[in-house]
């Protein structure tokens, strides 16, 4: 995978606040087979829209345009992306594109034990897997699925397949998994796992749940610093997590705290939904339709022009601190 030189600012993914975007989060499906209480507590229900999910060729054209404008990292998300039967073909196409140096996957892990070797062979560079509790009963209470053993086996298989580090995501929730912080610390002490705690975020369908269970990640940050954990610097394609390391631990701790005052200042990522809409912010507008420019290979220059023009309208920051989550009903539609 080669790096493509970007000639001038007009060719690059740069917004009006001079933030440069190297990272694309690409949802390839809204469908998920888990029923997490902070996202889809009633399970997935197909929408009545006629639009189908992006095809393999549409995905290739979309990522190609982002790569030509300087994007280096793609994260494949959902829903649960591995539910697509053409998931491996999608992955292989993305990894073959010039300029794309890193292809990551976010998964609930239910297929990980059986398929992780094929994922690695297809070109998945790194994996984030959701584990909201290390207690099988609490895992079931949060996810609605009795898959704890299978997911944990999948993490072990990922290391056997050659992944040197796995990122594990856990949504931090008061009165549910908040008491497991020390258990998670012990779990990563001798394992090369980056354990990432994500602050519960307010969405349109989950206001009551948010009010009941939100807990600030700052509480954990202060505890980590008191206990000798050190904050690490970020790379240009890193996500929003603040990463901490400790000399006595093999693993790392990451904190994603969207309610911090400066959370948006280092934003480096854009999102494309499974139906081909560009979303400039996780908690933003309805989305800019790209699909009409994903039909032929000779539309790349028009697609890049639309991307650049749209990016100039990206807001300086979200308004979560005001209780404004935009039009986002839940996170399954855009992959978080």
UniProtKB/Swiss-Prot annotation:
Keyword GTP-binding: yes
Function description: Catalyzes the cyclization of GTP to (8S)-3',8-cyclo-7,8-dihydroguanosine 5'-triphosphate.
Sequence ranges assigned to domain Radical SAM core in this UniProt record: 16-241
InterPro entries referenced in this protein's UniProt entry, alphabetically: Aldolase_TIM, Elp3/MiaA/NifB-like_rSAM, MoaA, MoaA_NifB_PqqE_Fe-S-bd_CS, MoaA_twitch, MoCo_biosynth_MoaA/MoaC, rSAM
Enzyme class: lyase
Family: Belongs to the radical SAM superfamily. MoaA family.
Subunit structure and binding partners: Monomer and homodimer.
Pfam families assigned to the protein according to its UniProt record, in alphabetical order: Fer4_12 (PF13353), Mob_synth_C (PF06463), Radical_SAM (PF04055)
Keywords: 4Fe-4S, GTP-binding, Iron, Iron-sulfur, Lyase, Metal-binding, Molybdenum cofactor biosynthesis, Nucleotide-binding, S-adenosyl-L-methionine
Sequence positions that bind S-adenosyl-L-methionine: 38, 79, 130, 201
Annotated SUPFAM superfamilies: Radical SAM enzymes
UniProt pathway annotation: Cofactor biosynthesis; molybdopterin biosynthesis
Residues annotated for [4Fe-4S] cluster 2 binding in this entry: 264, 267, 281
Co-factor binding comment: Binds 2 [4Fe-4S] clusters. Binds 1 [4Fe-4S] cluster coordinated with 3 cysteines and an exchangeable S-adenosyl-L-methionine and 1 [4Fe-4S] cluster coordinated with 3 cysteines and the GTP-derived substrate.
Organism in which the protein naturally occurs: Actinobacillus succinogenes (strain ATCC 55618 / DSM 22257 / CCUG 43843 / 130Z)
Reactions this protein catalyses: GTP + AH2 + S-adenosyl-L-methionine = (8S)-3',8-cyclo-7,8-dihydroguanosine 5'-triphosphate + 5'-deoxyadenosine + L-methionine + A + H(+)
Binding-site residues, [4Fe-4S] cluster 1: 32, 36, 39
Protein name per Swiss-Prot or TrEMBL: GTP 3',8-cyclase
Example of a GO biological process term: Mo-molybdopterin cofactor biosynthetic process
Gene3D superfamilies: Aldolase class I (3.20.20.70)
EC number: 4.1.99.22
